[in-house]
Amino acid sequence: MNTVVENSLEQARPVFPFTAIVGQEEMKLALILNVIDPKIGGVMIMGDRGTGKSTTVRALVDLLPEIQVVADDPFNSDPKDPELMSQEVRGRLQRKETVPITTKKISMVDLPLGATEDRVCGTIDIEKALTEGVKAFEPGLLAKANRGILYVDEVNLLDDHLVDVLLDSAASGWNTVEREGISISHPARFILVGSGNPEEGELRPQLLDRFGMHAQIGTVKEPNLRVQIVEQRANFDAAPLEFRETYQDSQAQLGNQILEARNLLPQIQLEYDYRVKISQICSELDVDGLRGDLVTNRASKAIASFEGRTEVTPEDIFRVIPLCLRHRLRKDPLESIDSGDKVRDIFKRVFGYE
């Protein structure tokens, strides 16, 4: 099936509404905060099979607003921001050419488990480059993911080198392909969302540390909630469009709340005393490097903006700090306490909540 047909089918297929998802609050919060501030650095979602990981990610993308892009550009170039433009678009603007502008939904790109590095990064047609003297570049998935979300299911089963490539691009916002002395770069600023089942193996600590957040989800045990989830799904499958209509108002409200939070974010204040306490917690937990401190500061500001406030409270920090630090702790086989609970315990002591 060609790409155009696939895309139209994807757009025609109704998506389960984000606000209809029952439970899994930790995962939903981590995703929303990454959309408010993509510099948080993505999220790794670990949990049992069938707990709605991919459903929730797709639902979030459906919730997000449309963005302006250059119409005939495969990199989703932003017509106003040079940092998010391909070299070709930048060149056209420098030559004072008019570029066609259109709007489109923020895209979510799925990374297949068996994808090669060429499929992910793109390829250079060396023969064409040598014979015609042009940089013939075939964009990969990273180009398609620019200004969107890159979703990797079962990321713990992906080749380590490929995970490294994804994390490098997510951190720098650029993808560079080099072949036979020819180098091509393009913007690749995306939110990286990985998911996996811990029974199938963990990511190496060096890779795990580079995800901004780590959400843990489990199968819902409460019988009443399970019944509610099953009924929701059955109602959606029976009449998806009517089901989506039921949640139209709550979807619009959440979408607006996220947009307002993004606009408010630059004004958020995090007290010096709180920043010191965050760093003290990281130090006491023996967290390597400063990523934990940085991400916790960013996430605390993002949640305050989501709540419509301009100042971060200790409660904001308490809600996000397990997400930001649990995957950065050194594993002790003799310790039975959950890593998230360990972070909360240290937080309570440092902030005087005991």
UniProtKB/Swiss-Prot annotation:
Gene Ontology, cellular component aspect: chloroplast stroma
Reactions it catalyzes? protoporphyrin IX + Mg(2+) + ATP + H2O = Mg-protoporphyrin IX + ADP + phosphate + 3 H(+)
What's the main place this protein lives? plastid
Single GO term (MF) = ATP hydrolysis activity
Return the CDD domains for the record: AAA
Can you tell me which residues bind ATP?
G47, D48, R49, G50, T51, G52, K53, S54
Q: SUPFAM superfamilies under this entry?
A: P-loop containing nucleoside triphosphate hydrolases
Q: Which family does it belong to?
A: Belongs to the Mg-chelatase subunits D/I family.
Spell out the protein name for this chain: Magnesium-chelatase subunit ChlI
Specify the species: Chlorella vulgaris
In the UniProt record, what gene is named as encoding this protein?
Answer: chlI
